[in-house]
Amino acid sequence: MWDETVAGPKPEHGLGRLRNKITTQPLDIKGVGEGSSSKTVAAVAGSPGTPTTPGSARKENVWRSVFHPGSNIATRGMGTNLFDKPSHPNSPTVYDWLYSDDTRSKHR
């Protein structure tokens, strides 16, 4: 599926030809320095190189907290202290609040 509004007319053969072209467009810079000037900027189609990272640095497992929420000792009891225990003896629990008549979803 090709969207002509966003991408323009569909190419006849393939996108490989489009990637190899170098496009130049004039860039007008006005009000910078003395007077106005026009410069041409060449944009090369393609992707930039991948930055290198040091191999000796150990990466932290970013998914640890998602798949093992209780693995962080500093935040282990945070959820139970905040959400599972009511702050006042007569205050509703999360379940009571979600399914009470006032706050329950009317969509059926």
Curated annotation (Swiss-Prot):
Family according to the record: Belongs to the DRM1/ARP family.
Ranges for region Disordered: 28-59
Knockout mutant characteristics: No visible phenotype. Drm1 and drmh1 double mutants have no visible phenotype.
Tissue occurrence: Expressed mainly in the low bolt.
Sites bearing Phosphoserine, chain numbering: S47
Protein source organism: Arabidopsis thaliana
Stored Pfam families: Auxin_repressed
Description of what induces expression: Circadian-regulation. Down-regulated in axillary buds within 24 hours after decapitation and then up-regulated. Down-regulated by the transcription factor ERF114. Down-regulated by heat. Up-regulated by salt, cold and dark growth conditions.
PANTHER family xref list: DORMANCY-ASSOCIATED PROTEIN 1, DORMANCY-ASSOCIATED PROTEIN HOMOLOG 1
Name assigned to this protein: Dormancy-associated protein homolog 1
One GO cellular component, as annotated: cytosol
Keywords in alphabetical order: Developmental protein, Phosphoprotein
Classification via InterPro entries: DRM/ARP
Additional remark text: Predicted to be an intrinsically disordered protein.
Biological processes per GO annotation: response to bacterium
